[in-house]
């Protein structure tokens, strides 16, 4: 089979565009159909394959190499290939693996960075022969395994191993053979423009690099403005000679070097050495000075070296005079002196009449000429590389010879592969014929088996149908006899059913009449029982309802009394606060009066005033004491009244709570009796179970009714008793008030006229309540203990009578409230005040 085919250049672009989604047979049929239907519009390309497929790129590549037409990887024939430089190498590998499907030539599973990585690694390993695996007659499984081993990493290692060192290229050109990847790697290293992919991905912009480049560019522009470069205005090839124009300027140093017959390069070297040594010396001096200063700072108490101190002083003066006018004048003087020296020296006479200088100039010109002719007859390859034509031919032969060697090797491998394919096809056809004969025998045997089984099934079907028909006839006859027997039995049962229905209807009528009569009698009896039970229930529940009403009324009265007591308590608290305020005012007046008495005593001793003026002052003191005693008496009575009312309010609250619990208990007992009565009436009993009632309540229902009747009588008589008690209390109060007024009028001993006026004013300010009048009269009337005892007993009687009138049922003894009264202590304090007044009178 020949690899030669006349494929035109316009058909190259359509190679590799067929789809490889299925097997080889599907691709063949689809290509045939597409060729048949598209024969009118498209020109059928010339092919060498019998299946109608297009030529592969590998076949076209080998054909072009054979006829001297080299297809470079740098060309843009990248249909279905991600990297154009790896196309030829991948095609050769696929042809070596004997991949016969169209899908293999898409080259979608190669890493485009393989050759790039190989070219960047650089040439280190050199091979004499290309990597070509020997073809052998193996099965398709070994080929697939070998294909799976081919990976981008292996391709990179191959490409890396194929590279060669450029330094040893001239000596090893004839004895080495290289693969196709060497050419692609060289091309990829030479020009980066060919490495573009079919669909390049957009790269992200690195702003840091952009900013760094902008800064560098700005710095370079500023430097160019400040230090402009001298341009070369001569035509021709641009060289770097214009940059060295200032190298041989006629300075004093240059002229001294010329006169001393020293070469310019050596002079420059000497100058550089001197400069470096001066810098080193200055740096060492700087370090020494820094060390000395550090030692000075570490030990401030020690003496400093005079030289160091002198240098430091000079440095300070120098720093202070950097911007002074003296420094500027010295600099200007130095510049003027240097200009005068330059003007006085005749450089032209020294330059053009000196033979040694001319010889040195000729030597320099010759050396520069040799430097210029260094790259004569050489080609600039770019990047500062100049090569001779001989070197270029050697490099080109070294690059092309391995390619041609590998092409010849691949051609031999292809011929061996064609022979192996022919042998395989022959063996496959032979096995296919054997398989077809086996299939024919299987089909004939299957037909025979089908006919025999069909005949057997027919015979079995006939015998089974006959058996089923006989059994069905016997079953029908047997069922007919059973049906006749059941029909006779059905007629007998129907006649019996009619007679039974008539009998049952008659019995139902009789039973219904009897039940109606019994229901009427039972309804009348139930109505009588209900009326009797209601009457009995009303009689039993009447005392409970009465108790409940009485308890609620009593609770209401107690609540009203509690509200009144609370109002009285608040009023008394306000009065107590007022009295305390007045007492504090009287105390302040007493203190002022005492101070005044002391002053008056002093004046009396000094001036000897009369007794009348002294008595008048003492009478004022007595009036104030009387007012204070009066307010204290009112305060004590109101405090006693307040505490008594608080006790009464607490008692009323407890009693109201007790009444509430009793009401709840009576309600519960009433509900219990009602429930027991309902249970007894539901059971049909005439009376309640008295034993159970006694266990629950503690007495029988009759006893409970009699007890509640006596309580009702007591509750009815309670208002009349309370009225009588209140009338008796009022009479007692009037008698006590009359007796107190007599005692206050007859038994009171007047202290002075001012004391009488105080008692009259105190009696005029008394409140309407009789208790307050009596207490005030007792405390303001005199010095005797009998009056105080009477007032205390009177307050006790009032509290006892009030409790008897308000709460008749309260059992609190009057002796339990004695500790709340503070009249005795106040009376004693009044006596002490009066004794003090009498002592002053005696003085």
Swiss-Prot record:
Composition bias type Basic residues, residue spans: 33-44
Modified sites of kind N-acetylserine: 2
Any single GO BP term: eisosome assembly
Bias-annotated ranges (Polar residues): 127-142, 163-176, 798-810
Positions where Phosphoserine occurs in the chain: 2, 88, 130, 182, 401, 584, 710, 763, 775, 816, 828-829, 838
Residue list for modification Phosphothreonine: 720
Broad class of where this protein is predominantly found: cytoplasm
Cited function: Required for normal formation of eisosomes, large cytoplasmic protein assemblies that localize to specialized domains on plasma membrane and mark the site of endocytosis.
Record-given protein name: Eisosome protein 1
Species name: Saccharomyces cerevisiae (strain VIN 13) (Baker's yeast)
Gene for this chain: EIS1
